[in-house]
Amino acid sequence: MNGLIIGMDLCDSCTHISCQGQETIWSVPTRIGKEPDSDVWRVAEESAGGALEGMVVEDKLLSLAMKDGTATIDGVRYEGLYLLKMFLKQVLAIPRQASGKEEIENLVITVPKLEVKLVDCLMYCADFLEIDRSRVHVISHAESFVYYVMSQKREVWSNQVGMFELSENGLHYYELRVQRGLRQMQVVADQEELEESFHLNVLDSEAGIQMADRILSSCAERLLQKRLFSAIILTGRGFAQTDWAADFMQQICKRRRVFAEMDVFTRGALIRSEDLCEAQSAYHFTCICEGRLKTTVSLKIQEREKEGQLVLASAGDSCCLLYTSDAAD
């Protein structure tokens, strides 16, 4: 098969798409418009201003689908799941048109918070789009962060790696550490939504900028302390420019490698998508993060007077795959 290999960062505010062989990362506001008195649905890329002029527009499609909500558009009531299906259909048309390919070989979707119901919704979307479920994988932001970092040079992840995300979704902190064992290396990633979060519109005023810089500096002092980090990453729209956060930058740059990457999650999703297409993974580690089991689950058994362990699920197995397997049974 020589189809499209895609990584997608799907959030309530904006969706980012990357595709193997394409340098462009497409950004599309997570909203859909319908032309009046027709069955034509459209999305608009941010590069085109994200405008859907003359259309009835519905946004926050993930939240709408998750709460089984509905929206009335042009006098017709639509389920949130249906609107999400139409949105993904339009979004996937972008890399299809750019590459001239229709078939999707593998699609990895990364989401801010991994929930069983959301995975179900996205699998229903795959059915609607006639993409085999075996080619669709849903992972957490933490897991895409892991694959992005582990694809870098060893010097980047030789010690702990911290990442601050400042976006429309709020302020989040991620931390990765590598645990080397006798059998296999474990990569553990934690994520935290910070209580000190603020909306990006506070950066529109000088007073708001000063407040945001103080908040970030306080968070960095509490989270990083004097620990050794091989890298600190900044991601999200709020860090598109960093000169406004002078005190924060000064603090995190002390004896640390710091770099900004706006598309960590979609790049990580694409890396994971590419790896899943290989006969053997290039990443020889057990990933422990949101959406993955932290410990091995086993039963103590006795067979012919000998005791042993029956492993039901291993550390690093996908929780969503386990759920899907149970549901199928």
What role is predicted for each listed range?
Residues 1-3, 133-163, 264-286:
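Conserved phosphate-binding catalytic cores of ATP/NTP-utilizing and phosphoryl-transfer enzymes
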Residues 2-26, 151-187:
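Gly/Thr-rich phosphate-binding beta-strand-loop-beta motif of the actin/hexokinase/Hsp70
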Residues 14-110, 115, 188-225, 229:
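Conserved phosphate-binding loops in N-terminal lobes of ATP-dependent enzymes
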Residues 82-150, 262:
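Active-site neighborhood for divalent-cation/phosphate handling
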Residues 107-119, 220-251, 257, 261-262:
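Glycine-rich phosphate-binding loops at beta-strand->alpha-helix junctions
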Residues 163-178, 280-310:
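Extended, charge-rich low-complexity interaction segments
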